Each structure stands twice: as C-alpha cells, then as structure tokens.
Regions:
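Catalytic cores of DNA base-excision repair glycosylases
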Residues: 1-132
C-alpha cells in the first residue's frame, strides 16, 4: 500500500509542479515520494546522462570484496567513497558493469566464480573464497 501511495503522490507532484516532466535536479528527485538516492542516481545517469553512482546490492558487495571500501554496507557511504575514485563521467557505466559482474561472476548466493573473474588479481576476497 505504501509503494502505491508513493507512486500516486509522485505522479501528482510531477503533474502539478513539474508539468508532467521528471526534474533533472538530483535534490528535486529526492523530494519526490518514494524516491531515494539509488532511484535518483539511476534517473540522473540513465535518463539524463548525467554523472551518477548507483549503489545497489551488487555494487556494495563488489566494492567490499575487491577493496574499494572497507566492510561498509551503507549505500550513501559507498557512493561517497566511489565519487572520490571514479571519474564522474564513468560512474553510471561503472555501476552497471558491477551489477552485471555481480550477477554473472561475483555472486552472492553461491560461491563466486573467482576462476572466471577479470578482477581476481586485485580482489581481496578471492583468498577467502579459495579457502572454502
């Protein structure tokens, strides 16, 4: 029910305040009901082609495993850390590649396929999985 209410309220605001257009401003997106950092970044990057870093579960898992962040599960903190090391124009594509890699190779529910991983030589977690 909450999601449906958020969608309805969001559509009403987009119609009344933005004349049926999605705002191109990150902070304006965050003010919309049901829109958080992940959705706002996804819209900024995929819809408007602007710099964005989408920290979903795959991105967070891989950033921890390869050592881009240290045992951090907070999406906002992972996003902040990535902004420091990823060129803005590369952020959106980088995150999409992490999602693809996380689904196909560096999986969460099964043992990752480290032997097929293009990041194996720099991955901190590889040794842990090799010992299992």
């Amino acid at each position: 029910k909450s999601k449906a209410r958020d969608i309805s309220a969001c559509m009403r605001i987009l119609h009344e305040q933005y004349h049926d257009k999605v705002p191109e401003d990150f902070n304006a997106l965050l003010k919309l009901p049901g829109v958080g950092r992940k959705s706002a970044n996804l819209i900024m990057g995929d819809v408007f082609g602007k710099p964005a870093i989408v920290t979903d579960t795959h991105c967070i898992r891989l950033c921890n495993r390869i050592g881009l962040v240290d045992n951090c599960k907070d999406p906002a903190k992972v996003e902040k850390a990535l902004w420091k090391i990823i060129p803005p124009e590369e952020g959106n594509g980088f995150c999409h590649r992490l999602v693809d890699h996380g689904r196909a190779v560096c999986t969460a529910r099964t043992k990752p396929y480290c032997d097929k991983c293009c990041l194996a030589d720099i991955c901190r977690a590889r040794k842990e999985f090799a010992n299992e």
